[in-house]
Curated annotation (Swiss-Prot):
Organism: Oceanobacillus iheyensis (strain DSM 14371 / CIP 107618 / JCM 11309 / KCTC 3954 / HTE831)
Primary localisation category: cytoplasm
Name listed for the protein in its UniProt record: Chaperone protein HtpG
Role summary: Molecular chaperone. Has ATPase activity.
Pfam families tied to this protein: HATPase_c_3, HSP90
Amino acid sequence: MGKRKFKAESQKLLDMVINSIYSQREVFLRELISNASDAIDKIYYKALTDDSLSFDVDNYYIKITPNKEERTLTVVDTGIGMTKEELENNLGVIAKSGSHTFKSENEIKDGHDIIGQFGVGFYAAFMVADKVEVVTKSIDSDAAFKWESKGSDGYSITEADKQDIGTTITLYIKENQEEENYDEFLDTFTLQQIIKKYSDFIRYPIKMDVTESKLKEGSEDEYEDVVEEQTINTMVPIWKKNKSELTDDDYTNFYQEKRYGFDKPLKHVHINVDGSIRYNAILFIPESAPFNYYTRDYEKGLELYSNGVLIMDKCADLLPDYFSFVKGMVDSEDLSLNISREMLQHDRQLKLIAKNIKKKVKQQLVSLLRDERENYEKFFDAFGQQIKFGVYSDYGQNKDELKDLLLFYSSKEKKLVTLEEYVSCMPEDQKYIYYATGDSRDRIEKLPQTELVADKGYEILYFTDEIDEFAIKMLMNYDEKEFRSVSSGDLGIEEDEKEENEQENNDNAELFTAMKEVLSTKVKDVRASKRLKSHPVVLTADGEISLEMEKIINAMPDDQQIQADKVLEINVNHDIFQSLKAAQGNDDEKFKLYTNLLYNQALLIEGLPINDPVEFTNDICKVMV
């Protein structure tokens, strides 16, 4: 047969395959291997209904052979082969899938499934090859044929000399171009990596001749290069093995082989689902966070396989952001893929899988918290901020899902506690869940604001992460108990203490007004403190914006500046208050000096910046002389 032209629509589609459909050139090998696997599967299915055929799996394989000198890459399979008519129909018409036709005409059982469905994967070879030759002999034909094409200019089919049933595809690899290195597809190591990445779990052996340096026989120090045929792929995926056969070491080895992390996983979840959509999954909860986890460079997602063939490195849609630390894979036979096999046509299937994965991860974390507290605390130390972010993000729509996974350090227990544990230990007269914010536990313990709450014997939660208070503001309450900062204006104290405090404010109203005039817009109010015992002064905040929030938001790089409504609280029982009263009306300069010093002192205690450090140090010097 002379050269024949592709149909006009086929020429356009071929151009799309070469230039547009696939995002990475290396997937051509995945497509050719998947086609080869399909060809062997077809013999298996044929043997189920044809008594004259036997199927011994040991006789079936795929072999990849690069030749750098001739710039060829050969893919051989011992599958069903193609007749002349099938060559014409399957390779002469682009997007005509022989595998799809075979599946339509044969009932597929026994857990096998043929991969191909669109009929374009073969043409991905033209992304890396100037010319492609296919020599094939069908199980249903005594003659062999060669299909040959250089791409869009057409193809030819001629008789060929081939004795064994199966197909040999030879790619004539392109010469290197300025921005494209095609030599890599002739490199044995690179080809091995591509096979392991995309086709590691193809059910038939993928073989290559591999050159290794070995000690010469009888020699102690002389080596020689030895060529050995090796099977590159794993073939049987761990997720299709019975869970009872697998040990923790098996899961750990898989975790490390797939390079999900360099540590050991803290926990694994093995999922097998046979329902409206069938899938298998192995999920891992890492022991530690990757170095870039809390940066924009980190990419979440699970490996997504279709019939054991990798189609996505990181499928982000399978995980909610708050579980982005989860590593692992999902394999399904029921995914509706697009023409490139790199994206899904419908997201309903993915949403069903993602919903179940979220549920399974939550169950595993709850189990870890309940039964392995030490390991859960190790997990929370690494990924707790992400759980808190999940409470805060999306306007708190996931807060009920995550609130029982939160841990905070307790002032009384001197360890991490859950919100449920905190509430269960609250005295009957305690109205609120109290918390204090700061850079560290040590710093929080020294805060003047904690004195009154601690003296009453109430437990205080320590918030040391920047996200903590934002998450709690979104949570609002737990078990109908509101959260209350120890720096807030109302701590829920007894009425008699309120009356005493109001009396102190009335008695010193003139002094507090004078202090407020000195500080001008720096504070909303100056008042007597009901919380201080030994410290002279403290800053608190009225309203929703706390002092800690002001500090965090103002430190962000977007130049967004906010200001909390600050209240300067004075301990009227402290000696310095008497000095302040003595200066009022008698020495205006000293009164102004003391007022500014107390305000700046309160700023320092809160970790807030002083507007004029030079003036502050000069004021200290004035007091000292």
